[in-house]
Regions:
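Short acidic donor-binding/metal-coordinating loop in glycosyltransferase active sites
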Residues: 16, 68-69
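Radical SAM/AdoMet-radical enzyme domain recognition
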Residues: 46-67, 74-178
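Short active-site-proximal "capping" loops at secondary-structure junctions
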Residues: 32-33, 70-72
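Canonical Radical SAM [4Fe-4S] cluster-binding loop centered on the CxxxCxxC motif
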Residues: 4-46
Length: 178
């Protein structure tokens, strides 16, 4: 580590995009909060994200979590993940990369790439019965199918469940389905 700064965390969460294809009731993105005055600036380019990643590695960061919005809406997501992995391998730091996704754009190609790159996948599943009410999209069965495919290929996966008054009653059933 060139310039490790002891006050920096060893893990960072990078919100790669403002864009999202869900409308979740529990969204924590400040630019979508009710009455928000948080400005939407221009998103970083691939080159800019690569520079940020290299600097974070220089300062001692080891683990990267990627989200958005919905990170899969970025055309360069695989390139960004590949860059994180390449720099980590060069520095003999093969820590997992965590991708937080709503799963809507997930496919077998993504799943295979994430397995190859040692990406830990965290997909949103706010409730099987209440999924559409929480997200604005009827996508629960597809997300569950993605969990099954991930398990089949040995991709580490987590169900990201935001517990609310609308879904607490189905929490354990949702967990068992994932």
């Amino acid at each position: 580590m060139k310039n490790s700064i002891p006050i920096l965390p060893k893990s960072v969460a990078l919100e790669l995009t403002y864009k999202c294809n869900h409308h979740c009731l529990f969204c924590s993105c400040p630019w979508y909060a009710p009455n928000s005055s948080y400005p939407l600036g221009k998103e970083l380019s691939t080159t800019q994200w690569k520079w940020v990643i290299e600097k974070l590695y220089d300062y001692g960061v080891k683990t990267f979590s990627l989200s958005g919005g919905e990170a899969l809406l970025r055309d360069d997501l695989h390139e960004i993940i590949g860059h994180i992995r390449m720099i980590g391998n060069q520095r003999k730091m093969n820590y997992p990369i965590i991708l937080i996704s709503n799963g809507r754009l997930m496919n077998e190609g993504h799943l295979k790439y994430f397995k190859e790159m040692n990406v830990h996948l965290s997909m949103s599943l706010p409730g099987y019965l209440s999924f559409e009410e929480h997200t604005g999209v009827d996508n629960a069965d597809y997300v569950l199918e993605c969990f099954s495919k991930a398990k089949e290929i040995g991709l580490e996966c987590t169900a990201n469940i935001t517990v609310t008054r609308k879904n607490y009653y189905e929490l354990f059933e949702t967990i068992s389905l994932a």
